Amino acid sequence: MEPQPGGARSCRRGAPGGACELGPAAEAAPMSLAIHSTTGTRYDLAVPPDETVEGLRKRLSQRLKVPKERLALLHKDTRLSSGKLQEFGVGDGSKLTLVPTVEAGLMSQASRPEQSVMQALESLTETQVSDFLSGRSPLTLALRVGDHMMFVQLQLAAQHAPLQHRHVLAAAAAAAAARGDPSIASPVSSPCRPVSSAARVPPVPTSPSPASPSPITAGSFRSHAASTTCPEQMDCSPTASSSASPGASTTSTPGASPAPRSRKPGAVIESFVNHAPGVFSGTFSGTLHPNCQDSSGRPRRDIGTILQILNDLLSATRHYQGMPPSLAQLRCHAQCSPASPAPDLAPRTTSCEKLTAAPSASLLQGQSQIRMCKPPGDRLRQTENRATRCKVERLQLLLQQKRLRRKARRDARGPYHWSPSRKAGRSDSSSSGGGGSPSEASGLGLDFEDSVWKPEVNPDIKSEFVVA
């Protein structure tokens, strides 16, 4: 007897009664489930026969973009808590009811942020995680911290671009020369000579802190798409690109400061810009923890690596040397510029030799003057003043709207409702003058034809009776 079409059932020769048994293709066939929500929506899912309840909730969480802790599944009035689906009698074509869970009461404030981060990361697909860690696409997360909602967008630097790598090395050498550190700037001056016009070093202003030419999107820690980095950028050595994690460190500022070779795992904020109250952006760089790296030194493709990057970024210390100046700082630089600026830093340069030839004494003097002109406390006070000003303006707007609504209600309840034609005629008659006192008539807002008071007396009665 030949096997039946489709290969779902296979029969053996010599079996009594031509008995057939299920083949491996039928055993591994996925089962189809119909998920019905309480709002009337239906979802069809194909899951393996040995799927667990936790795996099914994770699939629904990724599809609906809802944390799996907020999903509850029912099968014939039985809640699926844990274990395999077959243990609850779920088979091919079964109908499951999706019920959202409602939280009531108080929650632990200490466990909220971590749960929120994990819920946001668990809803990511493997493609999103891989694209983010390789620098192909940004990662956008919506996090809840206490009673506030926070949107975070991260972008790691792209890899495998030697020309852009030279640009980062030249920028690192420029920053090292601006700080007057010859031990770091001298070994990088030789590989920085063949910089092409496409990767030309940006013009360095007279102030020692170079400005960042790369655009930074508001509200996101995103590096510029044209800038790349690798861990050797921290050491200013252009060799061996696989010694540390390439996707963990990002930068988009040419003022990124080189760090020593024995750098501890963690992140450093290179630049930080406050665009508006509650809206920030900047760049960061760092080294991944060894537990998040594979044998070749590359970051592991899982959500644990992203969680480690987020934790390092939250615990990172502010790094002011690579911070792009704001408008207030640029005004302060113009006022507090040194008396004898370095002439070698004014024109556009394409090699590192001119940068290393700059005298370091005037640069250090300019740094001290800028720090005296713009202490860190003033920036914090400006942020607080801006936030207070926004709150006051919002309160004034709310009060103005409240006054307008109150006036509209008062006008609607008024005793006199004059038509526009009568008002126009009244204004014309009052302006033309004539008779007694037109100002009083216009002030009272009455017509000349209408009397102020009409006696409720029968007009047939004689006047003598009225007087008496």
UniProtKB/Swiss-Prot annotation:
Residues 182-264, 404-447 are annotated as: Disordered. PROSITE patterns: UBIQUITIN_2. Residues 31-105 form the Ubiquitin-like domain. GO terms for molecular function: kinase binding; molecular adaptor activity. Keywords: Cytoplasm, Nucleus. One of its GO terms (biological process) is negative regulation of insulin secretion. CDD domains: Ubl_midnolin. It comes from the Eukaryota. Signal peptide: none annotated. SUPFAM superfamilies: Ubiquitin-like (SSF54236). Residues 202-213 have a biased composition (Pro residues). Coiled coil: none annotated. Interacts with GCK; the interaction occurs preferentially at low glucose levels. Interacts with the proteasome. Contains three domains that function in concert to promote proteasomal degradation of bound substrates. Contains a ubiquitin-like domain (Ubl) toward its N-terminus that is necessary to promote substrate degradation. In the middle, two domains termed Catch1 and Catch2 are necessary and sufficient to interact with unstructured regions within substrates. The long C-terminal region associates with the proteasome. This is Midnolin. It comes from Homo sapiens (Human).
